Regions:
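Glycine-rich phosphate-binding loops of nucleotide-dependent enzymes
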Residues: 2-242
Length: 242
């Protein structure tokens, strides 16, 4: 049984059909590359899985159970975390406050337990992600590099027991070293039971870590192939020619 599956998803915005009968799945402990040129439908697909949009027809299932995501919270409660290019972090808050943003620990009087959140944040950063240069959860997120911000967002997702990460163009603003660290983290999370969907234009980055590739064009799936059955040259041809 697949962990996450899209079943004949169609999404229209007025007269525009953004997705047409899209079907694919993500397995347990699997990294899937969602590939395609601009306008292929990748962002719409991510927004549907994230609960931002609802399908016009078709449905999403998690562990074989049909889901009806009406908001991002529904998707998160099903174990899915979307990490966008901007990571949805607040630059003016500390790492600790960002990890618990919207999920703050309070006492019986409703007061924030800042010390407890700080201690847990430090444990999260040490155990879930190795982040060079971060030695304190008190650092402002605005002072972090792009790679460090991505790592904090991933650490937050892991701490809250997400089972599927949707990584939307995660390497677009990263240095070569940060990119290698992030791709390494995706593989590490796979070993720990977290599946990932890597949405990217960069086939070389996807090819390093993905087990399978789904290529989209004009809102439809044109290829669904395992890494063992293709090459990066063949993937490039499919993206360029479709």
């Amino acid at each position: 049984m697949s962990l996450l599956a899209l079943h004949n998803i169609t999404k229209s915005f007025g007269p525009l059909k953004a997705l047409s009968e899209l079907t694919f799945e993500i397995g347990h402990n699997e990294v899937v590359g969602l590939l395609g040129d601009n306008g292929a439908g990748k962002s719409t697909t991510v927004n549907l899985i994230s609960g931002i949009h609802r399908p016009s027809s078709g449905h999403i299932s998690v562990d074989g159970k049909r889901q009806d995501f009406t908001c991002r919270r529904d998707s998160a409660e099903a174990g899915i975390e979307t990490i966008y290019q901007n990571t949805a972090l607040v630059d003016s808050l500390s790492i600790s406050r960002n990890i618990f943003l919207g999920r703050e620990i309070t006492n019986s009087l409703g007061m924030l337990q800042l010390k407890q959140m700080r201690e847990i944040s430090m444990q999260v950063l040490e155990s879930a992600v190795h982040i060079s240069g971060i030695d304190s959860p008190d650092k402002l997120v605005g002072d972090l590099s792009g790679g460090q911000k991505q790592a904090v967002a991933i650490a937050r997702a892991v701490f809250f027991k997400r089972r599927v990460l949707l990584l939307d163009e995660p390497t677009s603003a990263l240095s070569v070293r940060e990119t290698e660290a992030l791709l390494g983290q995706v593989l590490k999370l796979k070993e720990e039971g977290v599946s990932s969907v890597l949405v990217t234009h960069n086939l070389y980055h996807a090819y390093q870590v993905c087990d399978r590739f789904v290529i989209m064009s004009h809102g439809t799936k044109v290829l669904d192939v395992s890494k063992a059955d293709t090459t990066i040259e063949e993937l490039t041809q499919h993206v360029v020619l479709t």
